[in-house]
């Protein structure tokens, strides 16, 4: 596989790091070049990293339930930066309270995310989706 740059991070005030490290490990082992921004990442930091690394995809996670607030407007920032062709993935515990995941997925796709993953998604599922969406299969 040719080198494909990805940006990975946990958005907003979220400090949940374990899943982020697991994803970094799995994505690296799958052959991707991962630029992990860690936790408490702002929208602007995601955009800057995508520009600097020529990222083909950005994977945003949120586990503290405020992803809907933290992710609002992110796609617009990518478009403003000329990055409208960069894939945007989001996953985790994205909303407060129990909501039907199909409704959560609909909300995030309406915000411009290409893929939305529920809590408990295995890394292999995201890797498969990336390979499909990037034409690497």
Curated annotation (Swiss-Prot):
Cofactors named for this entry: adenosylcob(III)alamin
Keywords, sorted A to Z: Cobalamin, Cobalt, Isomerase, Metal-binding
InterPro entries xrefs: Acid_CoA_mut_C, Cobalamin-bd, Cobalamin-bd_sf, GlmS
Sequence ranges assigned to domain B12-binding in this UniProt record: 3-137
Transmembrane segments: none
Pathway: Amino-acid degradation; L-glutamate degradation via mesaconate pathway; acetate and pyruvate from L-glutamate: step 1/4
Catalytic activity, as annotated: (2S,3S)-3-methyl-L-aspartate = L-glutamate
GO MF annotation, one: cobalamin binding
GO biological process, one term: anaerobic glutamate catabolic process
Leading EC class: isomerase
Residues given in the record as adenosylcob(III)alamin binding sites: 13-17, 61-63, 93-97
UniProt cross-references to HAMAP family, sorted A to Z: Me_Asp_mutase_S (MF_00526)
Job of this protein: Catalyzes the carbon skeleton rearrangement of L-glutamate to L-threo-3-methylaspartate ((2S,3S)-3-methylaspartate).
Subunit structure: Heterotetramer composed of 2 epsilon subunits (GlmE) and 2 sigma subunits (GlmS). GlmE exists as a homodimer and GlmS as a monomer.
Protein name per the record: Glutamate mutase sigma subunit
UniProt organism field: Carboxydothermus hydrogenoformans (strain ATCC BAA-161 / DSM 6008 / Z-2901)
Organism lineage string: Bacteria, Bacillati, Bacillota, Clostridia, Thermoanaerobacterales
Designated gene of the protein: glmS
